[in-house]
Amino acid sequence: MSERAPVVTIDGPSGAGKGTISQLLAERLGWKLLDSGAIYRVLALAAIHHNVELDNEDSLSLLAAHLDVQFITGNGLHGIKVVLEGEDVSIDIRSQECSNAASKVAAYPRVREALLRRQRAFNEAPGLIADGRDMGTVVFPNTPAKIYLTASAEERAQRRYNQLQDKGFDVNIDRLLSEIIERDDRDTNRSVAPLVPAEDALIIDTSGIGIDEVLDIALTHIQTKLPSVS
């Protein structure tokens, strides 16, 4: 599989800074953005909207193949806008109902295959920033510009704690840390598309360094691997 336009993959565990860096890179370069972590939630919401039963793999696969979704940057502190069939669903896909439904639809092999093809279809000019967990190993393995962001579990727990506190949630940082460690273990040891850096990825440990520094490191790597990028 060859890429139609330049692709930069940004992989890594939850809380490593993938979303922020991906958004900033897409805005800086004027490229399209794929937030693969939201794809299953978007599909689940589409299924709910279209009254597709969550145990109907055939219908879900067809819906996945034609999923009309966009990820729009340029929203500043509000982050990435997720648009499904022309409607802003950025908040809707974070509901518990949508989360539960996403877990169900993700279990079907044909749904996963359809969404793999749909994610690859995001590769359009002038270029794509692909944010996820297996972008460099599974979805776009042939791109030379791969980045893997990581950070200590403690650092990621603290970031998540700060985010939730800012939103007014009462959270326990020890519980957050435990959940992150458990999720890391599941993700790195799963049989299908485990969370591991691509062999040729640049690994950036974001522990203790600022967003601007991470962005500079990422841009330098991209310009080295993709000389046409300025």
Swiss-Prot record:
InterPro entries, alphabetized: Cytidylate_kin, Cytidylate_kinase_dom, P-loop_NTPase
Family classification: Belongs to the cytidylate kinase family. Type 1 subfamily.
Enzyme Commission number(s) of this protein: 2.7.4.25
Enzyme class: transferase
Subcellular location: Cytoplasm
Annotated organism of origin: Shewanella sediminis (strain HAW-EB3)
Record's protein name: Cytidylate kinase
One GO MF term attached to the UniProt entry: ATP binding
Chain's gene name: cmk
